[in-house]
Amino acid sequence: MKPSDPDNIAETLRIRTSVLDGATATMLAEATAAAHLPLADLLCLEHPKNVEALHKAYLDAGADIISTNTFNANALILEKFYHAKTSEHVVENINRAAASMACQCTRHAAAHDGHRRYVAGIVAPICPKPGDSAEEWLDACQAQMAALAEGGVDLLLAESCYNIAGTRIVAQAAARIAPHYNICTAFSATINDNGTLPMGGELEDLLDAVAVASPSAVGLNCCNGPQGFVRLLRKLKTLSPYPTIAYPGAGLPDSAGRYPANPQDFGQMARTIIAEDLASAIGGCCGTTPAHIAAVAQVVHDSGK
């Protein structure tokens, strides 16, 4: 570890610009389909080498923070949306395996060049339906977070938050779990072009919902790609008391599954974000690749921030 590398991810987010990794599920879509699995998270148990290779590709591209392959690894989400009735033991194993694998990849990278990397444990976004038990959702969120923490993640990152009620539950779970394991929390929302959450609510409501978890960062992800993303980020920056993270998707795919935003688009976006001091970490979401992250990393490196 270099002397300039803080051991705490919260401190890193306060003092310099970090590079986040890019998409997971879209990058693993082919492997998921080939394995006849309903979602990419299950690759962590069935075909871990595919996930490990993706982590390494993002680290090689310059990512300082990589994400666990656990976007849907919540027992109630698996049951309600994928009709996959799984035991608590299986869900725990997915999250532990994902965390352990990502941590091992960062340790290997650090051993090679002495640079500290971090692992964000990705927490599923939730949207309770009328009649759902809030306590059941809270328990499911806590179970996922505890397994990620026990697997060694540095940060619990609840991403793609798209409704306020669900975000409040996730934040309550994080407020209970994070102090127990002495790890940090962060939240990222996907929002419409008008700045509202897809299921209703303003950014002010989001910030109110997550405050209970004392997050180390709050940001935006996915949205509709880098076009217009900086404008949304400016709005969040003016409202939020927390460091900001930024990782848009590569836009909406066409009928052939091709995403419109290329690595150069992400490099240009990163230049604007850095020039305006809009984010403490920059990366990519759906449709992005190691090439997109390499473009961001080059801009961050050249900026010296």
Where are the model-predicted features located?
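Domain-level signal for soluble alpha/beta catalytic cores
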Residues: 1-305
